[in-house]
Every structure is written in C-alpha cells, then in structure tokens.
Amino acid sequence: MQIKNFGMVCVATFFSLSAGMAHATSGGEPAGPIGGSDVGSAYLPPPGLYGALVGLNLDGDKFKGDNQQVSQENPNSLFKITEGGAALLYVYPFQLAGGSLASSFFYGALHQHIRLGLPGGHNIFDSDTSGGADIYSDLLIWSRYVGHLGSYAPQGLHSAYPYPLPYGLTIAPALSLQFPTGSYHNNAAPSIGHNYYVFVPNISLTYLTPPITSWDEGVEVSTRFYYDISTQNHSQNYRSGDVLALDWAVADRVGLWKLGVAGSYAQQVSDDIAYNKPAYGTGNWFRMFAIGPVVYRDLPSINGFVKAKVTFEPVSRNGYPVTAVVLAIGKRF
C-alpha cells in the first residue's frame, strides 16, 4: 500500500533543529536539521514545495568534562543560544522503486553567548557573537511504505483525516551534508561556523501501531539514525571524530494532534585529531542524551502544522547540558 495523500501530517519531521548540535565542543558533535528529527521522521508529503520557520532557544551552564562531571576547572561556565531558521522541502513529482524522493534545505542565524569561567570569577574567555549558521541539506531522501507488519486499522475507525493513515512501517534512507557556510573566525573560540564539511548518511524508520484506546488512532514510533563524518579544519589542523547519533519520538495520535516524548542520543566513535595526534591527549570524545515532551498539531485551514518540543539533557560529555526549546510552523506553498 502506497500512501499518496499523507499531507502536512508528515512535513514537520523535516522542519525541526538536534539539541545535540548545541554543544560547544572543539570536535565531534552531531550535525542535523535545526532541532533534530522527531515525529513521523520517515514520512514524506505529496509532491510539491513546503516551507517552515523554526525557532530555537538553548540554555545551559556547568560545562561537563571528559568524566561527564561538572568541570571543577570551569565552574562558572555559561552557554546560551537563540536561533531562527528557515527550511524548504521539495518532494519530486515522480517515484523511484515505489518510494517518494525529496530534498531539503535548512539555514539559520543565531546569537550565542558562551563563557568558560575559572574559580573565583575569572574567565578563560567570554564570547558573545551573532552570525549565520552552517547550511544543512538532505541532498536526497527516499521514503517508502514497507507494509503493515502486523499493524492494521480496525474496521469502522473514525479518523480525523480523509485519507488512510500508513499503519505499519515506513523507511526513509537519506544522504545529507552540512556545508561550512556559517560565520567563522579562526581565533574565535568557539566560532558559530565550523569551517569543515560534515557528511551525514542517515536512515529513518516510522512504525504506526493500531489504536490502543477508543479515542486515539495509534501510536507512532519514529527513529532516525545518523553517522556524521567530518572533514579536516585545515586552518587549525584539526579533524573532529565521527559521531553516531539517534533522534527518536513516541507519540499518540489523537485527532489532529500528536502528543508524546522525543529525544536524542549521540556518541563519538573515533578520536578528534589535532596535528596528527589525539586532541587534548584523550581524543576529546563527545556524548549526549536528551529527552522531553513534543506536541504537534495539523492546521488544515492553512495546509500546515505547528509543533513545540522541549528537551532536557541528563547526560553530557565534553559539552554543556542544555535545556532546548524548539518551535516550528510550516505550510505548503
């Protein structure tokens, strides 16, 4: 069964930003769309051009070091980012091997305030800057409905949508790329832009279960796996380590609403390399885990959607544990 009229219900996944992107590490960190992926990450809408506006606020302090504990060397640290971004998604008017094809584009501008503070109130640095972020693009996405795999809509189900929902499994492999277009200054620590490319092969899976109550239409379970491969920053003779990342969401579908929990996990899997040696003697490995509520609603009157997500970060290694607030609104042009 190929779902051909799945509308804006599945657009929001591509207009989200990963809280994991908000870490001021010198090296490995996850690259991805503004806010990360969450609900419906494997779905594509019908052919056409879609756009969205996304806002992000990140607030953290108490830099955690290599042992995942608050750094005693920098107890007065601070991390704040406010970002606004725009996203475009184009779904091509043809299919390949039974699946839809699309490309996306994300661009944001941000203000960041980052401080590393020594005991006694002295600062290593206190950076307060604004500028454009690196461009992120899903160069090509291929989304295909695989099958029911045990999940069927019950007879007589009353749905808020005039078309069938894709009960079962949908997959969406993609090839993505982060471009070094952001504001970069070699002596800024850290700079907003990264001055290197990040290649991001990834795959999304979304499974919609049958309804579990008399008032819902099923539970939607989504995951998106990324493998981030960074090129070398030649101006600093530094290469960030590869990062394995996962965005996920579990949401109950209730009419035009999706209500659930979303999160991210990222783990660096190879050393940062500086001047042909492991950076800082340890490889500067990065890790993070974030979790929090997500709320999504379709807006049929404008053929659009609105979404809000808040995540908290109980696990952080070589980064700032942040509280992330993401707001997004989008529609079809």
Regions from the PLM with identified roles:
Residues 75-146, 171:
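Long, hydrophobic/aromatic-enriched structural stretches that serve as scaffold segments
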Residues 39-41, 53, 86-92, 137-143, ...:
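Residues on the lipid-exposed face of transmembrane beta-strands in outer-membrane beta-barrel proteins
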Residues 47, 78-86, 128-137, 169, ...:
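Residues that define the transmembrane beta-barrel architecture of outer-membrane proteins
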